Amino acid sequence: MDVSSLAAAAPSLVAPPLHHKPHLAFPPHHPSPARGSIGVRCAHSPSPHPLRPSAATADEEVSLPPSLRVSRLAEEFRVSPDAADRARRLLARAAALPRLGEADRVAANRVMGCVAQVWLVGRCDGAGRMRFAADSDSELSRGYCACLVSALDGARPEEVLDVDPADLAPLGGAAAGTGARSRASTWHNVLIGMQKRARAAIAAREGRPAGEPFPSLIIGRDGAIRAQGTYAEAQAMFLSPNESKTSELVKSLREKKIGIVAHFYMDPEVQGILTASKKHWPHIHISDSLVMADSAVKMAEAGCEYITVLGVDFMSENVRAILDQAGYSKVGVYRMSSDQIGCSLADAASSSAYTHFLKEASRSPPSLHVIYINTSLETKAHAHELVPTITCTSSNVVATILQAFAQIPGLNVWYGPDSYMGANIADLFQRMAVMSDEEIAEVHPSHNKKSINALLPRLHYYQDGNCIVHDMFGHEVVDKIKEQYCDAFLTAHFEVPGEMFSLSMEAKTRGMGVVGSTQNILDFIKNHLMEALDRNIDDHLQFVLGTESGMITSIVAAVRELFDSYKTSQQSANIEVEIVFPVSSDAVSNTSVNGSHHLDSSTVTDLDNVSVVPGVSSGEGCSIHGGCASCPYMKMNSLRSLLKVCHQLPDRDNRLVAYQASRFNAKTPLGKLVAEVGCEPILHMRHFQATKRLPDKLVHHVIHGKGEPTS
């Protein structure tokens, strides 16, 4: 289970709005013609398409303050006796709502995230008040639009921003029948669109420029790519890989029986080559860290004699250990650098501070240590000897912890090392504590309001560890997203800071966001694209990518594949997918004359035509000012290194010794092999994934300490 199920179970949970802060400036580029910045004009700049006040807003209602109008609207639907009555009220309001003209029923005015087509237009009139008009091709959705227009047409921009979505929660249950939950989010998405236009009106009134959009890539129905902004251009360069390099790699892989497992966060050049090569050699797999080792085992079973790992060192260590456990000790495992390929998160778990955290856990029985899989095998082994340990991923951590609390009475759970993920888990459980028992049961059937409140003081998380990539999604980036992209689909890795997490969780409550693993993010994008393709109506889907930019290659490949699979004899709608990179101008660097910013020399010529490349001047890949460029450690896995390793295999002259993945012959403080003890928490996780229960051996270890459970 990923955390997206929480939002589905609790549509009434809405994070409080963040306070506005100054936005960041970005290098100029041309905005998307489909969804550019909204032009909102006040008295000094009349609109070429003035909106007349809605006929649905009666004179006596207009005189009321917007807050009272909102309260009356909410009360009307709160006291409505049943869903059928509420639907009748919506249809009656829809009948009174004026239709928009064809000139306003265009892609730029579409409200994303609605089952039906919904259009919203807004402007600031001469009196400094917002004038709204809306329309839909669905009568129920038109009813929701009419509700919002009647409540907020004529309000001052600040009054529109003051509306709390929680105040309109009674509208959420107004629709009945199939797709009711999705259609009921229409009012929420329309409100977000109104508030976006109100912010733009305030900025125009104060003389503040709209600000440059984030860089983005737009994937057309024909698979063509349009890059907007120099950062996006740098990302797009390698999405159409060099055919000669692809052929060279495939030839070597096939002749020498080499398999490749790579993480999503690889360099775009490498991912582009791998994606193209996979069409000719099946033993290439790009994924998150969870399934890299499993994929390597399948490749060994299929006859691969070598596995090359494109990731950080703990990933190659895990591949080596799991292959040994599976009986493939003769299969060679190779890294992509003779130097250490580190990870800030893994380093945090090997610190003395983390050891102190575990010792504290060992003094608080019964305790279970839930450790993020993105840590070294040695760390897992040493931790498991101090406290019974199970690994987790960003997609199963919530289910793992909830099951542990349900299965072991009085348990203390100690999560680490990612501090942001730990804080986000605690935030999730606090949200669950105010849900109904029925809503909680949808998340985990063994829990209710009482059990969630009881476990909160027994959840502990390490507070001094984080991924340098996800650390960069700070408040400045969040403010810009809120200002310009609040109506877009928001995606966020579970490791992002709390502000980005809260913003994405709010979007999840209205079907517009996902918080989870890299695979969860990819699936979210694919699912929304499939829905658009099934509707076969012109559309522009805009996704803010709240994780490492290296995912773009896999996203583009998946989008292109879906576009190809939906080609039919009937006329295809013009559907586009836009991926927005929420990076600051400090998260890119000017190209230099004497350096290629740690890129291979083979790529320097290609970069001559690009003015910036991902990565700040220090070469770390991310900026402390907010926004992520890329993981510097992952970018050590270059195409040149991959080709070098492949060409030199088999390594008869021992020139690749420094590239071999570590095989742990070292022993733990209790005298056991690191590889053996370090693999056990991973095997516990696999058991949980297969059965949805913690293994008896682990439960016995937690409750009784040493020894095996009796059958």
UniProtKB/Swiss-Prot annotation:
SUPFAM superfamilies: NadA-like (SSF142754), SufE/NifU (SSF82649). GO terms for molecular function: 4 iron, 4 sulfur cluster binding; metal ion binding; quinolinate synthetase A activity. Its EC number is 2.5.1.72. GO terms for cellular component: chloroplast. It holds the Pfam family NadA. Pathway: Cofactor biosynthesis; NAD(+) biosynthesis; quinolinate from iminoaspartate: step 1/1. The active site is at C114 (cysteine persulfide intermediate). Binds 1 [4Fe-4S] cluster per subunit. Keywords: 4Fe-4S, Chloroplast, Iron, Iron-sulfur, Metal-binding, Plastid, Pyridine nucleotide biosynthesis, Transferase, Transit peptide. Its cofactor is [4Fe-4S] cluster. Residues 1-41 form a transit peptide. [4Fe-4S] cluster binds at C343, C467, C631. Residues 17-63 are annotated as: Disordered. InterPro entries: Fe-S_metab-assoc_dom (IPR003808), NadA (IPR003473), NadA_sf (IPR036094). It is found in: Plastid, Chloroplast. Iminosuccinate binds at H263, S289, Y372, I373, N374, S394, H493, F494, E495, T518. It catalyses: iminosuccinate + dihydroxyacetone phosphate = quinolinate + phosphate + 2 H2O + H(+). Transmembrane segments: none annotated. The keyword Nucleus does not apply. GO terms for biological process: 'de novo' NAD biosynthetic process from L-aspartate. Belongs to the quinolinate synthase family. Type 1 subfamily. Homodimer. Catalyzes the condensation of iminoaspartate with dihydroxyacetone phosphate to form quinolinate. This is Quinolinate synthase, chloroplastic. It comes from Oryza sativa subsp. japonica (Rice). The gene is QS.
